[in-house]
Every structure is written in C-alpha cells, then in structure tokens.
Design a protein with these regions (language model features):
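Conserved non-transmembrane functional hotspots
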Residues: 31, 36-46
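Generic low-complexity segments that are intrinsically disordered, proline-rich and/or Lys/Arg-biased
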Residues: 39-41, 53, 77, 185, ...
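Membrane-proximal, non-transmembrane alpha-helical segments
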Residues: 45-89
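Charged, low-complexity cytosol-facing tails and large interhelical loops of integral membrane proteins
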Residues: 6, 10-35, 150-222
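Transmembrane alpha-helical hairpins and terminal membrane-anchor modules
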Residues: 80-157
Length: 222
C-alpha cells in the first residue's frame, strides 16, 4: 500500500466525524453499485468542512462517481427496476406511517377494534414492501455486478481510485478519532465492502441488511 493512501487527509482536529463517516459509506456504496446522492455532501466539502485537501480533490471524486452512475444507467432494464424499487420504498413508508398513526389513534383516542386490525394490516403491508424492497435492491446490485463482470476493463482505474479514497478516508477517520479520544464503538461504519485495511467487522450482512457494520481500528489496536 502506498504511503499516500496511509496518510490521513489534512483536516481540523474537531472535524465532523459523522460527515466523514457518511462520505465513506457513500463512496463505498458506488463500489458495490449502490448509488447514493452526493449532492448533500457537495456544498459542505467544497466549503472546507472536511479540510482544504479533500475540498480540492472533491471535483475528481464526484466526477468519478458520476462516471460509474452514468454507466450503470445504461444497463438494460435498469430504469424499470429502479422505478419499481422506488415505488416499493414509497409504499413501505406510506403503510408504516398510516399503520403507526392508526395505532396511536386506537391507543389514545378511540377503542374501535376495526381500526386496530386495520393498523396491523397496514404494518404488515409495510413489512412485506420492505422485504421486497430489500430483495430488489440486491437484485439491482447483482445485475450491475454482472454487467461490470462482462466489462471488466470499464472504469477499472476509476473504481480503483475511489477504493483508494475510501481506504484513505478510513485511515483519516481513525486518526482524528484517536486525536480526539473518541471510542470507535460509538462511531460505527456501514459498508457494502469489507476488503479494507484498518477495520473490524462487528456484524455481517443478513437477509434484510446488505451492509457490514464495522468500526475503525486505532493505531494501537491489533
């Protein structure tokens, strides 16, 4: 591993650790073909929230993310799968909110039994929609992986660059957590990939969980 990757980005000592963690998760997601939205990060990073060095590099990082996103959107059937994926997410949220409101209504305002059963029905629909949403999310990732397996040279260097950025950000997170006396257990990371140095896996992906839960290792940890 090169010295540059192991060297943390220069940031102020009291850096926003949550912003740093979320950025790691965002970029790692692109490497696993889960496309998050970089927009919420753009203004903060450009303004120097994560230091001048990363602010200067952000343009290249974002351009690399967009290369992957643009390629993925050209995959056959991708748009229809995304629409279904989004619809299921919206349905799950709507059923959850409706069911929760009915439970509150039954508990505090009325004892109508049919409202109780209706709330349970909505919550059941929400659970079913969430399960299908998770299944479809994985199906999307598989379809994208199959595409890149067939086109292994496509943006290979871009993906390697982004992986190096994630690795360096992980070392950066560990450096500033140690500098500020923070407990890694209180700042876990959610990652789709686990092939990074300097992390410890706490939980592996499950049926409804597609990410690893990890914590960074500090310098004095094995």
């Amino acid at each position: 591993m090169s010295d540059k990757i192991e060297k943390p980005y220069r940031m102020r000592k009291n850096v926003n650790l949550n912003l740093l963690r979320n950025l790691i998760t965002l970029i790692d997601g692109y490497l696993a073909n889960y496309l998050g939205d970089p927009e919420p990060f753009r203004r903060k990073i450009r303004a120097g929230a994560l230091g001048p060095e990363l602010a200067k590099e952000w343009k290249r990082i974002e351009r690399s993310l967009m290369k992957i996103a643009t390629t993925i959107r050209r995959i056959p059937a991708f748009k229809s799968l995304v629409k279904l994926h989004t619809s299921l997410k919206v349905l799950a949220t709507m059923f959850m909110l409706s069911g929760s409101m009915l439970v509150i209504s039954v508990s505090f305002f009325t004892g109508e039994i049919y409202l109780y059963y209706l709330s349970m029905l909505f919550l059941t629909f929400s659970a079913i929609s969430t399960i299908w949403y998770s299944i479809l999310e994985r199906r999307l990732a598989i379809k994208i992986k199959e595409y890149f397996d067939e086109h292994q040279t496509k943006y290979r260097f871009t993906r390697q660059y982004l992986r190096n950025v994630v690795q360096r950000l992980i070392f950066t997170l560990a450096y500033y957590m140690k500098a500020n006396g923070k407990d890694p257990e209180k700042y876990p990371l959610s990652l789709y990939n686990e092939n990074y140095n300097g992390i410890k896996i706490i939980k592996k992906p499950g049926f409804l969980r597609s990410k690893y839960k990890v914590i960074v290792k500090l310098d004095d940890e094995a």
